[in-house]
């Protein structure tokens, strides 16, 4: 076989094996003034489900604390008068925490989980149910141990959650510490 025939055979074989995806949309136009040619191009953007949730100080790993010190202001334990925050750390120092929720999901739920607050010296328990939380009406704060479903998304919401100690029960003198975990789940 001659070199010329071999080259032609190789070129034909390569052309037949070329994938169709390398061919772009095209049009040839010719003529006088106003001649046009156009080509179409399609786009695709793939966006996965996502959720961002923040309670308190901005930053991954920041855990704020809200303090209720019944020694401050001469509050009597168990007198039924609610106690506002008297200190804490980060955004929780005044008992008013910034909350932000962003998600492209059509529905989400927020759950509040945690055991009890445990006394450091007595190992006694103080239930989270003795702490009340309210919201500004944008992001519903769930009761401790409960879950709330939010209205249809997508969501780009901010709110403030305000905490107080109910002070309706009498507990042994101690410092009671505990952590509640708020979890947002896309549904």
Language-model features, listed with the residues they occupy:
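N-terminal small/polar-rich segments of proteins
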Residues: 23-123, 142-187
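Bacterial N-terminal signal peptides that target proteins for export
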Residues: 1-8
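Short, surface-exposed beta-strand/strand-loop-strand elements in extracellular ectodomains
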Residues: 120-134
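Hydrophobic helical h-region of N-terminal Sec-dependent signal peptides
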Residues: 8-16
């Amino acid at each position: 076989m001659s070199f010329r025939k071999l080259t032609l055979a190789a070129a034909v074989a390569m052309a037949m094996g070329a994938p169709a995806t390398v061919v772009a949309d095209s049009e040839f136009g010719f003529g006088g003034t106003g001649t046009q040619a156009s080509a179409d191009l399609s786009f695709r953007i793939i966006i996965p489900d996502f959720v961002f949730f923040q309670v308190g100080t901005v930053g991954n790993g920041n855990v704020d604390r809200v303090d209720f010190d019944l020694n401050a202001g001469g509050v009597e334990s168990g007198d039924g008068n609610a106690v506002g925050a008297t200190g804490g750390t980060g955004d929780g120092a005044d008992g008013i925490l910034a909350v932000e929720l962003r998600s492209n999901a059509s529905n989400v739920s927020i759950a509040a989980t945690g055991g009890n607050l445990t006394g450091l010296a007595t190992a006694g328990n103080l239930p989270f149910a003795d702490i009340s939380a309210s919201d500004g009406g944008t992001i519903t704060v769930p009761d401790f141990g409960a879950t709330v479903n939010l209205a249809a998304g997508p969501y780009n919401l901010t709110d403030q959650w305000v905490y107080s100690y109910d002070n309706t029960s009498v507990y042994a003198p101690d410092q009671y510490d505990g952590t509640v975990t708020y979890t947002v789940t896309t549904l």
